[in-house]
């Protein structure tokens, strides 16, 4: 494995197309500008970076570190775990498990970065996979790249929750759905966005996609599955086996991820803080647009997604 060392910080590549482990860093809000610059550079290069042994990190430190990467932003509909920005990811509902997705793409300016901290990890299973949507695009055959460049798709937070977790109690699914869709969003995105920092083209799809514009439901599904097969290809992914105290940070503009629900009844608890993003722009220069509601409402704490970028 290739290791790049600068000062006390090490960056060790762990996947051919995606993923690196960073050592020599104690995460928190007191990191030097130089260290934050190194972390951000590794994040843009490797798309997801991992830190072991961050057991000292609590809710305050988690959010303070997030502020070094940008403006933290709360989830548009789901209440936080701490009354501020940290979203609880746990084994009780598992509604986002067992599916490939990019966080919160049902709003126009979805998060730029997600920072996930492991609190309680089961004795087996519960891994997370990430896929590189930039290399998925660049490795497409040219005719498919040309096609993808021309497409737009509608993303929504309304989807079939029961199909994702068929063994869950109906009342638990109904309760989670009521919260998750307390505001029903529909946003039109380009299928290919131009990354605002790297200039790379990335595929913008995942399980929030309702339909590709201009196609029948069947044709849209077939085309989505075709593009997703390139995103999910094993050589385009990295898998992380969690330990308590681990932290993963990913570029949400250039990745999808998949939480594996395979740890039985064992508890799995993580906390996620997201950093505000900007409105995607396609290869033709056309930005994403919110279809409904008319505006993104302010969450119970903090700013609405995209508010810091628009300011």
Indicate where each model-derived feature is located.
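Non-heme Fe(II) oxygenase catalytic core, chiefly the N-lobe of the double-stranded beta-helix
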Residues: 2-247, 253-311
């Amino acid at each position: 494995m290739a290791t790049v060392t600068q000062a006390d910080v090490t960056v060790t590549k762990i996947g051919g197309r995606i993923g690196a482990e960073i050592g020599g860093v104690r995460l928190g809000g007191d990191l030097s500008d130089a260290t934050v610059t190194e972390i951000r550079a590794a994040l843009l290069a490797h798309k997801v970076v991992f830190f072991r042994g961050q057991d000292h990190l609590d809710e305050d430190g988690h959010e303070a570190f997030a502020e070094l990467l940008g403006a933290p932003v709360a989830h548009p509909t789901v209440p936080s775990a701490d009354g501020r920005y940290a979203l609880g990811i746990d084994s009780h509902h598992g509604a986002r498990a067992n599916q490939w997705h990019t966080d919160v793409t049902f709003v126009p300016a979805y998060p730029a970065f997600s920072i996930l901290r492991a609190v309680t990890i089961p004795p087996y299973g519960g891994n997370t996979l990430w896929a590189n949507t930039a290399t998925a695009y660049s490795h497409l055959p040219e005719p498919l790249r040309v096609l993808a460049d021309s497409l737009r798709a509608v993303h929504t937070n309304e989807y079939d929750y029961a199909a994702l977790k068929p063994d869950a109690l109906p009342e638990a699914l109904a309760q989670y759905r009521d919260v998750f869709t307390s505001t029903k969003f529909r946003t039109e995105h380009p299928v290919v966005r131009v990354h605002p920092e790297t200039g790379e083209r990335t595929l913008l799809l995942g399980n929030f996609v309702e339909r590709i514009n201009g196609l029948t439901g069947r044709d849209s599904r077939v085309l989505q599955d075709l593009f997703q097969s390139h995103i999910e290809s094993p050589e385009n992914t990295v898998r992380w086996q969690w330990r308590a105290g681990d932290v993963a940070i990913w570029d949400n503009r250039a990745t999808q991820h998949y939480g594996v629900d395979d740890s039985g009844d064992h508890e799995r608890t993580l906390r996620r803080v997201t950093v505000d993003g900007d409105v995607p722009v396609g290869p033709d220069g056309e930005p994403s647009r919110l279809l409904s509601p008319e505006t993104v409402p302010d969450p119970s704490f903090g700013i609405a997604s995209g508010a810091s970028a628009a300011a």
